[in-house]
Regions:
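Short hydrophobic alpha-helical segments enriched in small aliphatic residues
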Residues: 753, 774, 783-786, 790, ...
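Active-site palm subdomain of RNA-directed nucleic acid polymerases
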Residues: 193-199, 602-625
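Compositionally biased, intrinsically disordered low-complexity segments enriched in Pro/Arg/Gln/His
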Residues: 737, 746-751, 760-774, 778-784, ...
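Conserved "right-hand" nucleotidyltransferase catalytic core of DNA-directed polymerases
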Residues: 1-9, 14, 106, 117, ...
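Short, low-complexity segments with poor structural confidence in diverse proteins
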Residues: 800-809, 814-824, 828-830, 834, ...
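Conserved DEDDh/DEDDy metal-dependent 3′-5′ exonuclease domain
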Residues: 3-4, 15-19, 23-190, 395, ...
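Acidic, low-complexity intrinsically disordered tails
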Residues: 562-569, 665-744
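Generic long, charged, amphipathic alpha-helical segments
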Residues: 428-451, 564-613
Length: 868
């Protein structure tokens, strides 16, 4: 089969980037200017309107047609060249795309950067690019000039000059088109680009068919959203102008808003969501409060989202086509660069679908009852996609697929067992976040309430791929909790997932070994799912259990740039943020790529099965599959069963999910959701009337236990508590969360953390250092030695709190060391700090105890210099 490389140049009044290839191609003004083509390694030829149809395009069945971006060329062929110039339709199976092949090998999509990455010569002719812009679109409209026009040339001379300039532009355009064909041919045949696997080639063809099919846009709803947004923006802008006396006239004037806020003593460098919320949380003056509140309301871009969807919808049938890009990410996941359908907000607020009617009616009052109207509209924007008349959308998506895949790859059996139990019973008590919270906090799952569940959720989302404090804050938006508290939660998550933590190390080690030795490396032996690392001298590949490989071009092993004694990292080149630059990855990041790639392959197999059954897949988003079917022809259970059908390569992987259907892509919620956690909590776990504010009570009883204020001198704090506190309930909750039996250091001493030796000499030094600190600790526990780094006069102390429950009185005894005259109150830590070695009057010969209330709880010993 011969290969035809071709590139087409067109003219249109329609904007290609703003409307997409399909709307551009069907526009009445769109026409072909010329196209160039080459047969195999032959000479590049040019076709222009009026020329006969080339033979290879008249009989396309026996040829393969390769273009750089086949979305554009296929649309121009179907809607321009075939109906107007007599070209023969080319079967979809005979098309191929050089850009998709490059993306599948983790190389850039843009031609110039791709040639740079593939070491191919490429010359960007700025004159030819300018000529292409002049010929491909009408000249920009100019404002009428106020200057007096002076006639310098006669019309005939101007016409001749225009014709000469146009002829010169066509010459430059032809040269540019020929250069594009040569570049496409060289890139497509580059030895650095490995061909697609047969199943991936089949997926590429299915992707083109799904993009051609498209999904319907809900035009009335989108138009109503635009009108609603315009009214809200107008009201916000009017108020801003009134407040600032015309200084700020629009909520989009970010520099002016920052200037106005900073003039009142603030130091805002950005107006991002977190920055604005942080300033508002500190209760600024009324002017700052109102102006930032208006900015927060006006920051929602729901109006722009609706306009973008309308612009990409076909004027013929309102369907959005070409919205999905195959290999939008290096892991193989799809993206939606044009209309950005993957960026549509979920209905996280669980708003009723009845509010869609309120948007259609422009009912601001009803919308305002559920929050800011712009925010409500943003949460409902998935209603902008709908089914065709007489059809429904059946949407099925995997549940916690990344957590499931990670546990399956690493062999975290307790988690896999929990997923299987949840899939069988559908008991919300067994939800993954509750199970993780129970494992992290070492409590019974029946005692997991909403705060503990949120901790489990945050840990699962932030720590699954090795994330630490930064990842936790980024995912949760928590900027107030101390680092030590968050690190305590992170350590608990890692302690509950020892095999996942081990898997990060195995993957990083296998990748480094493959690069260093050039030999195939298995991450884990059978029967674990097979993940292999290989290196061909230039690119590292990680082969997934499905058989597909993720590529890391120009990979090499480099020292860690984050930790002095950390493991080496893998450096490779990536098209990050549109730039071909070097980036780094370690074991956790590589595991994230493997997990996302495996989840993507699960979705790919589901798409193939659905299309094989004759179902019409119209859209898919990350882990979700959307099928359009005539009403009553297909059930939700059938689609969900197909999605959860495990492929042969994923044996033992528990899959779960949910499904909903209706005329809209938005999930229907007829009534406010029930608080499942509150319903399933047992009566014995409900807070008592005297202990409704857990955080406040904890801070009152145990200073700094929940990030509270600095502890005060107990001698000066003799005033009785005016707020009744259920101390027994407090102790019970602290025991459930694993907070008892941990004391803070009461003086400074060095921490060595995860110190690692890079040489035998350094190893001996570390051993001596650790032995020295362990020896100091043993002597300190028995009261015979004071740590040499302790601040003079800051001795240790233990505080005994006791309560006489029969008499209803409380007493507190304070014991100080011989080196200080000022007692220091004892502290309880929520973050798992190690014991400080304080002398404790309740200590006996068998164990060290610290009394809290009427009971004494043992304090476990920890090795100095190691994380608890």
């Amino acid at each position: 089969m011969t290969t035809i490389y071709w590139d087409v140049e067109t003219y249109s009044e329609c904007n290609l980037e703003g409307h997409g290839a399909h709307v551009y191609a069907i526009h009445k003004s769109t026409d072909g200017l010329l196209f160039c083509y080459a047969i195999d390694d032959g000479e590049i030829q040019t076709w222009m309107p009026g020329d006969p149809v080339p033979v290879v395009f008249a009989n396309p069945a026996d040829h393969k047609f390769v273009s750089d971006n086949w979305d554009f060329e296929r649309q121009i062929l179907e809607h321009v060249l075939v109906p107007r110039y007599g070209f023969a339709p080319i079967p979809l199976e005979n098309h191929d795309c050089a850009q998709r092949l490059a993306l599948a090998n983790a190389y850039p999509a843009k031609v110039s950067r791709r040639c740079e990455a593939l070491d191919l010569p490429f010359r960007e002719d700025t004159d030819a690019r300018a000529a292409m812009r002049r010929l491909s679109s009408p000249p920009p409209s100019k404002k009428p000039s106020k200057r007096k026009k002076v006639k310098t040339e006669d019309p005939d001379t101007l016409a001749a000059a225009f014709a000469a300039a146009r002829e010169h532009d066509f010459k430059l355009l032809r040269e540019r088109c020929q250069n594009d064909v040569a570049t496409t041919r060289a890139a497509y045949n580059s030895p650095l680009l490995k061909p697609l696997l047969p199943e991936e080639r089949h997926t590429l063809v299915l992707d083109a068919a799904i993009n051609t099919r498209g999904i319907c846009a809900n035009v009335p709803f989108l138009q109503a959203v635009i009108a609603l947004a315009d009214e809200e923006y107008a009201a916000i802008n009017a108020r801003l102008s009134e407040m600032t006396e015309g200084e700020i006239t629009a909520v989009t004037q970010v520099p002016r808003i920052k200037k106005a806020v900073n003039a009142r003593g603030h130091k805002m460098t950005t107006l991002g969501k977190r920055s604005v919320s942080a300033v508002l949380a500190h209760q600024p003056d009324d002017f700052t409060q109102e102006i930032l509140t208006l900015r927060k309301k006006g920051a929602y871009t729901v109006g722009g989202t609706a306009k973008r969807l309308l612009a990409h919808a076909s004027p013929e049938d309102s369907r959005i086509r070409g919205a999905l890009r195959y290999y939008g990410g290096a892991t193989g996941r799809w993206s939606s660069p044009g209309p950005q359908l993957h960026g549509l907000n979920r209905n996280d607020s669980e708003l009723s679908i009845d509010l869609v009617d309120a948007v259609l009616a422009g009912d601001h009052t009803t919308l305002a009852q559920h929050g800011d109207p712009l925010k409500v509209a943003a949460n409902l924007c998935r209603a902008g996609l709908c089914a065709a008349p007489g059809h429904v959308l059946i949407c099925a998506d995997f549940g916690a697929v990344e957590s499931r895949v990670t546990a399956w790859l690493a062999g975290e059996e307790w988690k896999l067992k929990g997923f299987r139990e949840y899939d069988i019973t559908h008991d919300e008590r067994l939800h993954v976040y509750r199970q993780v919270a129970a494992q992290m906090l070492n409590i019974n799952i029946d005692n997991v309430r909403q705060p503990e569940r949120q901790t489990g959720k945050s840990g699962e989302l932030a720590c699954n791929f090795g994330g630490s404090i930064g990842a936790w804050r980024k995912i949760t938006g928590d900027t107030d909790t101390p680092d030590a508290v968050l690190m305590g939660y992170i350590k608990k998550w890692r302690k509950a997932h020892p095999k996942i933590v081990r898997y990060w190390q195995l993957v990083g080690r296998a990748a480094r070994a493959a690069i260093r030795t050039g030999k195939l490396q298995f991450v884990a032996p059978a029967p674990a799912p097979q993940v292999m690392a290989a290196y061909d001298g230039r690119a590292l590949t990680l082969t997934l259990p499905s058989g597909r490989a993720i590529t890391y071009p120009n990979a090499r092993v480099v020292p860690s740039d984050k930790f002095e004694d950390g493991d080496p990292e893998v450096e490779f080149f990536d098209n990050a943020r549109g730039q071909w630059t070097a980036v780094r990855a370690w074991g956790g990041k590589l595991v994230e790529n493997i997990v996302q790639g495996t989840a993507r392959d699960l979705l790919r197999d589901a798409i193939i099965r659905a299309e094989a059954r004759g179902w019409k897949v119209v859209f898919h988003c990350h882990d979700e599959l959307v099928v359009e079917a005539p009403e009553g022809s297909l059930s939700e259970s059938e689609v969900l069963a197909l999605l959860l059908e495990s492929p042969p390569w994923a044996a033992g992987l528990p899959l779960g999910g949910k499904v909903h259907s209706g005329p809209l892509y938005l999930e229907a919620l007829e009534s406010p959701p029930k608080d499942k956690i509150a319903e399933q909590s047992t009566a014995t776990n409900k807070p008592s009337a005297t202990d409704t504010d857990w955080n406040a009570a904890l801070e009152r009883e145990f200073p700094r236990a929940n990030g509270g204020p600095k502890p005060v001198d107990p001698v000066e704090d003799e005033a009785p508590q005016t707020t009744p506190v259920d101390e027994a309930a407090i102790r019970q909750r602290m025991a459930e969360q694993g907070l008892l039996g941990r004391a803070r250091r009461l003086h400074k001493r060095p921490r060595h953390g995860r110190a690692r030796a890079s040489s035998p000499r350094q190893l001996r030094r570390l051993k001596r250092r650790r032995h020295r600190h362990q020896h100091c600790r043993r002597r300190r526990l028995h009261g015979r030695h004071r740590h040499p780094n302790a601040r003079r006069g800051a001795g240790t102390v233990a505080v005994i709190r006791s309560a006489d429950t029969s008499a209803g009185t409380r007493s507190q005894s304070t014991f100080t060391s011989t080196r200080t005259a000022r007692p220091i109150s004892g502290l309880i830590s929520t973050s798992g700090f190690r014991h400080a070695g304080a002398r404790n009057p309740t200590r006996n010969t068998s164990s060290t105890k610290m009394a809290i209330g009427p009971r004494a709880h043992p304090i476990p010993s920890f090795r100095i210099g190691y994380p608890s």
